[in-house]
Amino acid sequence: MTVRTRFAPSPTGYLHVGGVRTALFSWLYARKHGGRFILRIEDTDRERSSMESVNAILEGMTWLGLEYDEGPFYQTNRFSRYREIIEQLLASNHAYLCYCTREELASMRAEQMARKEKPRYDGRCRERHSPREGVSPVVRFKSPLEGRVVIRDLVRGMVIFQNNELDDLVLARTDGTPTYNLTVVVDDMDMGMTHVIRGDDHLNNTPRQSNIFYALGKEPPVYAHVPMILGPDRQRLSKRHGAVSVMNYREAGYLPEALLNYLVRLGWSHGDQEIFSVAEMIKLFDIEDVNQSASTFNSEKLLWLNQQYIKNSAPEHIAHHLSWHLGQLGIDPSKGPDLAAVVKAQQERSKTLLEMAHNSAPFYREFEAYEETAARKHLNASVLGPLRDLRERFKEAQSWVAPALHEIILATVESHHLKLGKLAQPLRVAIMGRPISPPIDVTLELMGQATTLARIDRALAWIDHRSNA
């Protein structure tokens, strides 16, 4: 048997971290077992679905590297198939037409609640054989009245539902459009899904869907219901906790592999290991090892993990992702120093690629103004002489590499009887516009001789102007 898993989001909003974790678990399970991973877009809610959301899902999957083997398949292209199955269920007496009006259903619900009963459809149309004039019917599934449904869940173990507690769910609305519980069964059946990994908010749908499978003469797939992700307040993760689109994490400067690593550890672990390559995830992950209890999303832990990935990844890999962020700032990284070298100079301290992009910008374009506090502190008349001397030494430099530049700075400091910081910091502000940069000799090598001289000239002119103002 070839393992077949799927990710089936609804394009009614952004792709959030809970959905990504579900997709990741399904993808890892398929990859671990040499199976197939299918992407299905459940877009039957035409009012709320949008192509913008579809594109956001596809973009997110691509950025994360969760490549799918088949799809994307769209449910709106399969309405004729759903109608065919509805007719089959009606013909086999596993479904029936229900003519109850909304008012009648509301009255039924109110009476049941008054009797402190669980609200549910009472089946009054199960054996109705004549249409009701002026009423468009829905199609309901004729749920078994006896027996039980046993779900052998890979995460939760054996879960048992009594059929007499399940009501007759709607399969098709009055306008003929199919409902979720029908479409998901037909799709999983037609697409040969062997394993369905999804959030545990779907657990109560599982016995209903299983009964539809049985009515169609098919065995349901193996299910695994993973617990939800909670915010720090132990409430379900939402926008107020930062549960934004996965692409917002890209915009904030997170690496895709850092986000995947963080999400795989929400509910799953392998000893005390914190950091996993994608290859290690595929090798070690097992859906049966996922915890049953909910996990808490910790933004600080994600940030720490992102920092570790930035620090320890190949500079060329970081540069590939950093180039996108520089592009967002209107910077073409091909017009300047080697981007991998710029990355290497900053990897040790950068927490996000967004931070690194802003810190890298002065290497590729002139900064608009000096950081005011730093300029007032470091660019003053007392450094005019040392800076002019340093500029002349730089102008005559025969080798523009960090060790040689370091020696030039030391020689200048000694000749003016200064401590290194008294010249290095003004130089840093002059070159970068701010008091923070990689080591000053490395910064100068990356900046290049011509740009370094031009920026020292700019700083000298700025100091002169302030001194004479």
Curated annotation (Swiss-Prot):
UniProt motif 'HIGH' region: location: 9-19
Localization, UniProt: Cytoplasm
One record GO biological process: glutamyl-tRNA aminoacylation
Gene: gltX1
HAMAP family: Glu_tRNA_synth_type1 (MF_00022)
Major localization listed first in the record, in broad terms: cytoplasm
Protein name per the record: Glutamate--tRNA ligase 1
Short motif ('KMSKS' region): ranges: 236-240
Pfam families according to UniProt: Anticodon_2, tRNA-synt_1c
Task performed by this protein: Catalyzes the attachment of glutamate to tRNA(Glu) in a two-step reaction: glutamate is first activated by ATP to form Glu-AMP and then transferred to the acceptor end of tRNA(Glu).
Cofactor: Zn(2+)
Uppermost EC category: ligase
